[in-house]
């Protein structure tokens, strides 16, 4: 019953008109009246922000704020993989033979997420992370490794909540939501960075130019809280034993080790 009521509410409120209205409001000067309250409610760390709160004129500007230089140091070990976002690690684990990952006890198909069995095949028996960004988090996305962008594509249209309730009761949001997928190679292995849109707001903006990525370098931003899924090819990654789910993590902090370092 709870699942049915949750889905009914989401379907009744999640349509193109409400999405456009919310996006328009967030970009309007009127939304600026809510900035102070928003910062207090979500406990935004103003000491880290590039600008003072009074310099943000709309909620949209606050959502996509940049941070001061140096407040997110990137793990210096050249063999490490770092978090691309400030987030909560909601889940992590091994991708099964049938292309499924288990998130909050619920199976999700990476073939659906990536758009085909062919695209998913390299990640079978690999590793995954689910990184959830709440409205309070810094919304910019950075590269978790240094490598080369091999392919980039978008899937999905609508977006549903990707918070804990969404993962538990929703209609498979990690597979169905609007998502922008970036596939990166390094040392002959690949990593998929799946940026998933949040309810109402599908906007995922790319900021990186060129094919070469440097670990810790900005590559995109969300216009609202959302989720990043990392998919590692089999044999390419070893998680840091200190990492557990759920736990908070910040941009540049170590998630684990790329294959070449682990093999040594």
Swiss-Prot record:
One of its GO terms (molecular function) is phosphatidylserine decarboxylase activity. InterPro entries: PS_Dcarbxylase, PSD-B, PSD_type1_pro. It is a peripheral membrane protein. It comes from the Bacteria. Pathway: Phospholipid metabolism; phosphatidylethanolamine biosynthesis; phosphatidylethanolamine from CDP-diacylglycerol: step 2/2. Disulfide bonds: none annotated. Binds 1 pyruvoyl group covalently per subunit. The active site is at 86 (charge relay system), 142 (charge relay system), 226 (charge relay system), 226 (schiff-base intermediate with substrate). The record marks 225-226 as: Cleavage (non-hydrolytic). It catalyses: a 1,2-diacyl-sn-glycero-3-phospho-L-serine + H(+) = a 1,2-diacyl-sn-glycero-3-phosphoethanolamine + CO2. Its EC number is 4.1.1.65. Belongs to the phosphatidylserine decarboxylase family. PSD-B subfamily. Prokaryotic type I sub-subfamily. NCBIfam families: PRK03140.1, PS_decarb. Heterodimer of a large membrane-associated beta subunit and a small pyruvoyl-containing alpha subunit. This is Phosphatidylserine decarboxylase proenzyme. It comes from Geobacillus kaustophilus (strain HTA426).
